[in-house]
């Protein structure tokens, strides 16, 4: 289709040329035409001088416009340098933020290892504590059984006292039997004294075990509390680390985007510089009508004024962003100080946990020894119970056999009663001592509860401080996002201004090409006229 159009145009042009040649051949010898060919070049030469002067004036105006364009370009280069400096500042802050994140990750790994060690030691301590509690329960059951046996013996002594009052009348006929009974009572007293000694020993062992158990419980409670503290602090640090990683990823993406935009801007500026050089080379060849140049000039002036307005707006926004970045730096410094305080607090807690871990290892060895002693005492108590049951059964048989024969044992039974009362008072004293020890244990428990409440208050304070730090961090992140959005808007505006500048350069190129074409056309026309004039003179 394009070839067809070209052929049609060539055919029309050929017909026009043939018509013009035919007319020229017909009129070339006409006297008026000879006169016109002689006079017309002289008229066109005068008009050409006027046109050349007008073109020179247009050229001066174009040079002034070029100077203005160069000044605008210089301003844009200055703005670009300022943007590059701002970008370097942002890159430095980003690098500092990444370094801080790396240190936080290292601390988190250390805290995780400490947490694992504490959990293992705590589990071992809990297992040993369960074993100690079981052994203490067994000892308490044995003590309760011994107390029940003592109560039975006291009841039997009361029955014997009633039998004594009833058998005083038969005392005279049973002297021989009284001797044998006294021997039996002596043996019974020996067995009772042995049982009391064993009971006292068992009570002392129980007291020691209860004290050790209370100490172990206190240590386990402290370990649990410190573990809970560390777990809460680790969870909070993990959340902060996740947020910091997200912000880091966002900053890296924005950094890449800003770098790509800056690269594009540099390429565009280099292209504009080359175009401006080309325009400077081609400005000397401009020759076009005044109306076209004035219209182009007005369009360029309007575009330049718009660009200057946009540049002023961008400068104002950059100043606002610098103020916001300064405020954000202050907030970050505050948050870093608070984080350092919290890290020092966590290190103190780690030291406490390490000391507690050493105490638990020593406690494990003591627990093993105590378990062996508890097993030995359990066996001895079982043997004593068997022996006591056998002795009590023998005493019952003998007393039942000799009750009918006992007559006169008032004095001996009174002595036995006095002994039993002494033993009873001793048992009561031991019971009072055990009660006092239980009261002390309760007091220790209340003190431990107070300490736990105090630690919980400290945990709440730490949580509140961490919440404040998180709020400051979230504020800084929101400000970062706002700054980034504004930077994106500025980049878009800069790209628009560059696009407008490219359009202006294209318009300048088209004007230059039109000037070159008009100049060539004028030169060709003047040459043709001179040739015609010379040919007419030759004729």
From Swiss-Prot:
Residues 427-439 have a biased composition (Polar residues). Keywords: Actin-binding, ATP-binding, Coiled coil, Motor protein, Muscle protein, Myosin, Nucleotide-binding, Thick filament. It holds the Pfam family Myosin_tail_1. Myosin is a protein that binds to F-actin and has ATPase activity that is activated by F-actin. This is Myosin heavy chain, clone 203. Residues 39-520 form a coiled coil. Residues 39-539 are annotated as: Rodlike tail. Residues 241-302, 427-453, 517-539 are annotated as: Disordered. Residues 1-38 are annotated as: Globular head. One of its GO terms (molecular function) is actin filament binding. Residues 241-300, 440-453, 520-530 have a biased composition (Basic and acidic residues). GO terms for cellular component: cytoplasm; myosin filament; myosin II complex. InterPro entries: Myosin_tail. It comes from the Eukaryota.
């Amino acid at each position: 289709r394009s070839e067809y159009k070209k052929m049609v145009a060539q055919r029309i042009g050929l017909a026009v040329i043939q018509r013009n040649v035919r007319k020229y051949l017909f009129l070339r010898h006409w006297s008026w035409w000879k006169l016109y060919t002689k006079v017309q070049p002289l008229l066109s030469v005068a008009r050409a001088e006027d046109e050349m002067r007008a073109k020179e004036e247009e050229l001066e105006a174009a040079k002034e416009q070029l100077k203005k364009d160069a000044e605008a370009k210089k301003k844009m280069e200055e703005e670009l340098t300022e943007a590059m400096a701002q970008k370097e500042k942002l890159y430095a802050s980003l690098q500092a933020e990444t370094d801080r994140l790396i240190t936080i990750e290292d601390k988190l790994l250390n805290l995780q290892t400490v947490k694992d060690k504490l959990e293992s030691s705590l589990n071992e301590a809990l297992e040993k504590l369960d074993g100690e509690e079981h052994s203490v329960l067994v000892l308490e059951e044995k003590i309760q059984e011994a107390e029940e046996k003592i109560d039975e013996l006291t009841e039997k002594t009361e029955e014997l006292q009633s039998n004594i009052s009833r058998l005083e009348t038969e005392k005279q006929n049973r002297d021989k039997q009284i001797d044998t009974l006294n021997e039996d009572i002596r043996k019974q007293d020996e067995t009772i004294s042995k049982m009391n000694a064993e009971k006292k020993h068992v009570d002392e062992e129980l007291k020691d075990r209860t004290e050790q158990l209370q100490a172990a419980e206190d240590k386990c409670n402290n370990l649990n509390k410190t573990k809970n503290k560390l777990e809460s602090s680790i969870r909070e640090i993990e959340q902060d680390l996740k947020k910091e990683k997200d912000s880091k990823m966002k900053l890296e993406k924005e950094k890449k985007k800003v770098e790509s935009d800056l690269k594009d801007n540099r390429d565009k500026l280099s292209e504009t510089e080359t175009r401006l050089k080309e325009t400077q080379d081609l400005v000397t060849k401009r020759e076009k009508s005044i109306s076209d140049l004035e219209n182009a000039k007005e369009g360029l002036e309007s575009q330049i004024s718009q660009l200057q307005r946009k540049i002023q707006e961008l400068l104002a926004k950059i100043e606002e962003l610098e103020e916001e970045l300064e405020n954000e730096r202050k907030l970050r410094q505050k948050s870093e100080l608070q984080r350092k305080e919290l890290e020092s607090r966590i290190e103190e807690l780690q030291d406490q946990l390490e000391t507690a871990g050493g105490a638990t290892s020593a406690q494990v060895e003591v627990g093993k020894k105590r378990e062996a002693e508890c097993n030995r005492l359990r066996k001895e108590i079982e043997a004593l119970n068997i022996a006591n049951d056998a002795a009590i059964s023998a005493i019952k048989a003998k007393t039942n056999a000799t009750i009918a024969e006992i007559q006169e044992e008032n004095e001996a039974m009174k002595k036995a009663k006095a002994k039993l009362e002494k033993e009873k008072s001793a048992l009561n004293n031991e019971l009072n001592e055990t009660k006092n020890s239980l009261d002390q244990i309760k007091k220790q428990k209340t003190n431990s509860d107070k300490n736990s409440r105090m630690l919980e208050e400290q945990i709440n304070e730490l949580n509140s401080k961490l919440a404040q730090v998180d709020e400051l961090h979230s504020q800084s992140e929101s400000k970062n996002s706002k700054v980034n959005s504004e930077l994106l808007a500025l980049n878009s505006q800069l790209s628009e201004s560059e696009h407008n500048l490219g359009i202006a350069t294209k318009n300048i190129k088209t004007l230059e090409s039109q000037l070159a074409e008009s100049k060539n056309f004028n030169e060709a026309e003047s040459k043709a006229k001179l040739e015609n004039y010379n040919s007419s003179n030759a004729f």
